[in-house]
């Protein structure tokens, strides 16, 4: 299921199925992961944010629900199972006349199956599932639940339309180099210089899950820009604060992408991202909307 960013993509896909086809979607906690400690500040934890599921008005089934879980487990062998291909988690499943056209490939079809009930698994990291209505709903949720501590409220009150948010993801990215790219100071400077060419930058606000790991990158960037570290917030506080910006330079973190998706400025924002954020990215990917600025890698430009 992943962290909050991945969970929001999965909810956006469920919302897409509900809006487009009228499906009644239920979020199933097959992973058995614990409900999130929304006051926690540990970025390593990958918990389930059930309060957002409830806010989006989806049904939810988990092992602790007893009878409902028992019914699901008995029914599960008789459900057709559709599973997203590992290399296609950002490829939009276009809709057409068939009610299965927006489903990933069929992975299991029991000889006896229940009609009109399906099990679907995947990440669905395409901007095309993220409707404006859904993004507004997530922002409204954050605005209703978050009360910033004094230090972060001071940061929020100092933001202007010239401010820029940047986000460094390290943590589990460093543990899985076969999947994730690590973007350093060079990527962020390219993005910042691009934004500065359009409008001056007053301050650059830095978000990260591991500031110790990016000290050398920040030292390089600070030679050109005035940096402000955003530290000490919960996951919700960081995402809420991230949504208060109008300008962003981002890398491979879905958490940061959702901060931009939920910006209070809606689509009237400037966002710089890498064209290929993952090592297994493809030309078919639809991570980012077309108005976001996508940077090619330096070696591809030189070639």
Residue ranges and their predicted role:
Residues 1-9:
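A short, glycine/small-residue-rich beta-strand->loop->alpha-helix junction that serves as a flexible
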Residues 2-3, 31, 124, 170-172, ...:
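Short, flexible loop/turn elements at secondary-structure junctions
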Residues 4, 193-281, 287:
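Donor-binding and catalytic core of enzymes assembling or modifying cell-surface/extracellular glycoconjugates
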Residues 10-17:
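Short amphipathic alpha-helix
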Residues 23-34:
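A short beta-strand-loop structural module common to alpha/beta enzyme folds
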Residues 35-55, 213-224, 282-289:
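Short, aromatic/basic amphipathic alpha-helical patches
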Residues 38-200:
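Secretory-pathway luminal glycosyltransferase catalytic domains
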Residues 277-303:
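Leloir-type glycosyltransferase catalytic cores
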